[in-house]
């Protein structure tokens, strides 16, 4: 037993005392009132006596619980035993001590017999003896445990001291090894001193809390002594000592913030600070050595490849320099830039030279290198057919002449009987092939004729014998001279009665075309396409000229040539008519034509037959391109799709940049555009043009641009080869434009969309009609012309003031006549002071429509009465006349 209330030790240690249950005694439970509405279950024993009489007031009783030893010390002494016939009942082990100390209440118990009291005293004495033995055993165990703990702590201290000594000596050994490697003596000796030689900071406490050994608190020895001294105290709860608070950290003490906690720092009782690591010491020594020896890093000069534009960040990466250094250099030059800013190649070259690098400048156009103008060896050259272009004025019989040579009828297939496409054909004469290119003669097809002249070897100038030299004839002569190709004059229509070939030769002299009959070198042949007269002579002249030119090409190389025409066919897709000038083109090859590329799916000749190859001077249709190239673009075969795609993307980007530059140059800023509209007042006629081939669209665009004036002009919103689609209608609706289809039609979706949007679609197959209709429509945008016709003058003799009418001028007509309702001007001292309309015109008292010269009349003006005698009235009529382009 003990006085400590906190002692949780149960006096009866879980062992149930063996008791002999007396006969005639029954146990039960009752609810005992605890007060304030609380109850508890109480075990009671009922004793039945053998006497025949029962006590009427007999009630169940409960065993008396053992009171605490501290409350009743007198009961701790054993009482003298009394004889009893049965053993005393033991207290229930499951009842806690608090319940034993609780005062009785609620139920009045009967007095126990002497034997029962004696038995209970014996049980209580035995329990007290067991408690004393248990307390003694626990005290012995506590002393033994403390002794073992002290021994373990002593061993840990010795081990920690040994490790601390090793850690303190290791930096000194390592520093000596590093010092031997350093050639020059350095003042780094102070850094290599062992940690044990460093003076401890004065402000550091001898045993800081942050470095205390694990499992051991400050003042533990004193606590151990205190526990030894109190070993004989009464048994109770072991009071744990509170950990000592860490001493306040002195100013400048880094504590645990410098690095991690190690065993060396934990047992460092002298308070020395944590030392620098070995790698840090090596870095410091190497840095000091370089500074002492003034060692400089070797500059590496690199070859920097510079495109046309480059960012500062990318330039610095190519030079292996820091972008900050490049920006500093630019700041010194007076330019404030960011790493992401673009600079041109000139500035980039200046920067690279400043940093000591060499520069190699490249251009985006380098992707096109090696695909054109590849030189061929002379022994690989073979003779090729001549390429002949037929040129001349419209309706002079160019296509008819070619039809007669080919024995075909192309004129019947052309709308209006005029050629609106470039046609490429190949004929054979005496076993030799000749390639013909037919060009349009209309004025709108100037670009086509120019392309035909550039891609040709010989130009045939067709001149009608009855029409002589015409404007497009002169233009064809100029194209041929600009291309540097020889000319053969074919004087056509000699079968007509009005034909005069000599007149043609004479007029050609004015344009520096000297035929052989006039002492020149130009061949001339009189032919008739209708009657097929002298066609063989013309072909012989062509072959003779080709022999003089000695035309050769290398067929055993990649193909190269010119796009003659391109169109978008519904069933075949993009189709380009090309003229192979060098090499041989075969299906499956990858070609680049303008800004389009593709793999050749099929080759079709001028007769509609599929061919397996196309050699030099052979015209073929190419299927398989990604889009329609522009007529006149050059094509070439490349080795891979990636190369073709790269070239195509580069050319498309160039085309976009040119279009943007053209728009920005013509449009400028918004203020400039508004100023231009206010000053010039130019009206635009928007159009969406779709044609069958690219060349026709180009001709239409050129013809419409020529119609523009200072007041109105045609603006082509979109143009392309192919049929009219729903997207074209949407574009026309957004831009309020009209749609023109040249030899193409709109599909059903486009027609339905145009009906819903109210967009007009006009179809044409002759360029004359298209240009005339657009010209008439553009004329409607012109403001009408104001024409003024002088009628006569009248002199004011007197001014009358009439009621309800106002001032009326009495006049005499001095010149011409005066009409009512016409425009009048009031002239005073030769200065026009008013211009308006004549309201009233009377002769005597009658209203008249006009007054002739020499007669007198009365006049009144509309909304004007400042008239005086002596003023002159000038009458005129204004007419508005519709203007045309």
Curated annotation (Swiss-Prot):
Gene Ontology molecular functions: GTP binding; GTPase activity; guanosine tetraphosphate binding; translation initiation factor activity
Region ranges (G2): 417-421
Pfam hit, one: GTP_EFTU
Occurrences of domain tr-type G (ranges): 383-550
Location relative to the cell: Cytoplasm
Region (G5): 528-530
GO cellular component terms, A-Z: cytosol
PROSITE patterns linked: G_TR_2, IF2
Domain of life of the native organism: Bacteria
Region feature (G4): 492-495
Signal peptide interval: none
Region annotation (G3) ranges: 438-441
Region (Disordered) location: 1-295
Biased composition (Low complexity): 63-77, 184-201
Listed Pro residues bias regions: 78-94
Stretches for region G1: 392-399
Binding site for GTP: 392-399, 438-442, 492-495
Family: Belongs to the TRAFAC class translation factor GTPase superfamily. Classic translation factor GTPase family. IF-2 subfamily.
Functional summary from the UniProt entry: One of the essential components for the initiation of protein synthesis. Protects formylmethionyl-tRNA from spontaneous hydrolysis and promotes its binding to the 30S ribosomal subunits. Also involved in the hydrolysis of GTP during the formation of the 70S ribosomal complex.
PANTHER family, per the entry: TR-TYPE G DOMAIN-CONTAINING PROTEIN (PTHR43381:SF5), TRANSLATION INITIATION FACTOR IF-2-RELATED (PTHR43381)
Protein's name in the database: Translation initiation factor IF-2
Organism: Sinorhizobium medicae (strain WSM419)
